[in-house]
Amino acid sequence: MSQQRTLNNTIRATGVGLHSGNKIHITLRPAPVNHGIVFRRVDLDPVVEIPASGDLVTEVILCTGLTRNGAKVQTVEHLMSAFAGLGIDNAIVDLSSAELPIMDGSSAPFVFLLQSAGILEQNAAKRFIRIKRSVEVRQGDKVAKFSPYDGYKLGFTIEFDHPMIPHKQSHYEMEFSTAAYIKEISLARTFGFMHDLEDMRERNLGLGGSMDNAILLDDFRVLNEDGLRYGNEFVRHKILDAIGDLYLIGGPILGAYEAFKSGHALNNKLVRAVLADETSWEWISFPSSAAEQPPVVYTHPACI
């Protein structure tokens, strides 16, 4: 049986908000079966709970943000990506601010936190969303698409007119699994261009950004002294973001995702398009008595 998962223990961390620049405290807690991922704004009175749901997405410029009852939580994509990568179905995320900490700009610190807390398999079958027929959304020349597939596969193409992002480094595909996610995706950092930085600061965005938590490029080169973690780190980070954005669909996915120049807005548009068309997907579980077995996607917790 492919079982639901939560954390074995509570774990805490502190970091800086990418856009606010504020110090943020985050606490990750176990949650019961079928609870899902829920963010809690514990700095508010009363505390506001915000489920990790695609239909609550209200912010898609430079991050993915959720809003419920007037309370916001922004920059959820990297933690959601880590949850998806390790197969965590149920968790409570307490926040002292309206934004998650950016950590080092990748999801690797969140993966480390989850591994440190331990992963607990629960006595209930994991519920997958299986794509039954293709769904595609477009915005100008940008495209994002889901197709039926026995497993979870992601392919992404970016297009930037920059010498550090040549065409041969602009496409990446991966067969999703916990091991592949940790090794190939989790270390890829968010990135930005110097010429965009001033505009962002004028809009009170990117106030916590630095070369400690992002790749920064001028017109010709990467400015970070340590360079890149992968030769194609830019497109790998886009897949990292997509994995987090798509996990807001409400569960792990069985299907193939293909994207060209997609971002948070189009990823959310795809999630909403799938959920709005009940003929395009179905819930499926793989109890121990089932004749059909789940694709090998998630590594056993003892091996993570």
Curated annotation (Swiss-Prot):
Protein's name in the database: UDP-3-O-acyl-N-acetylglucosamine deacetylase
Needed co-factor(s): Zn(2+)
UniProt keywords, alphabetically: Hydrolase, Lipid A biosynthesis, Lipid biosynthesis, Lipid metabolism, Metal-binding, Zinc
Keyword Hydrolase attributed: yes
Gene (name only): lpxC
Gene Ontology annotations for the cellular component aspect, listed alphabetically: membrane
InterPro entries named in the record: Ribosomal_Su5_D2-typ_SF, UDP-acyl_GlcNac_deAcase, UDP-acyl_GlcNac_deAcase_C, UDP-acyl_N-AcGlcN_deAcase_N
Gene3D superfamilies reported in the protein's UniProt record: lpxc deacetylase, domain 1, lpxc deacetylase, domain 2
Annotated family: Belongs to the LpxC family.
Transmembrane segments: none
HAMAP family associated with the record: LpxC (MF_00388)
Record-level Gene Ontology MF annotations: metal ion binding; UDP-3-O-acyl-N-acetylglucosamine deacetylase activity
